[in-house]
Amino acid sequence: MALGPDRRFGMRVDTMTPAQTQAAEIDAGLRQYMLRVYNYMALGVAFTGIIAMVVAMNPAVMQAIVGGPMVWVLFIGIIGMGFVAPRIMMSKSVLAAQSCFWVYSAMWGALIAPYFYIYTQESIARVFFITAAAFAGMSLYGYTTKKDLSAMGRFLMMATFGILIALVVNLVFLQSSGLHLLMSIVVPLIFAGLTAYETQQIKSWYYEGDMEDATHKKSIFGAFLLYGSFVTMFVWLMQLFGVARE
């Protein structure tokens, strides 16, 4: 039966075909799924900010991070979570997936806590909104584009490994300000592209038609990916545009 008005008994009744009904249900389900992804991500960003402020108010912890090995523990922990968390999130329970996400967010918060001492509050707020605008634009593009971004995503994922190696080499051996400046420009561009790719991938996962538990874990994993891209962009843009305290 085609979509159209039914005027029997003086009443107008719109009907839809089964295919149209299914499409409407998919659209509603997709919106709910993506909203859950973005809600988790936003909560993760807020949690990171809270942890960063709490750590910044504790001089002993700050000293351990800035003047001790704790910064390397956090750095290695964050990198390790990037490899381990996806397996846990997709193979364990929803609670395990949530726990990984919150631990990851907390470690990032502790790592960037020194920013409250290094940079002015105005520049932190400004760079945060710049990052949010760039993230929103690229995520919207990834969600709406009909172009397959898989090839771009694979290339950018390979580029992140190169960036990671260059970062470690520069921190430990070279300590080159020029290379650091170059990375501050390149890294946000890479993760902006990854934001679009990840959004497209996260959207495609919904159409796999999993049970609610699996879909919930996918939304947490999707938030984990987008959160990582957002925070990485913010960190490097801070080093590029942040204004140091006098």
How would you label these PLM feature ranges?
Residues 2-246:
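A hydrophobic alpha-helical transmembrane-helix feature that marks the membrane cores
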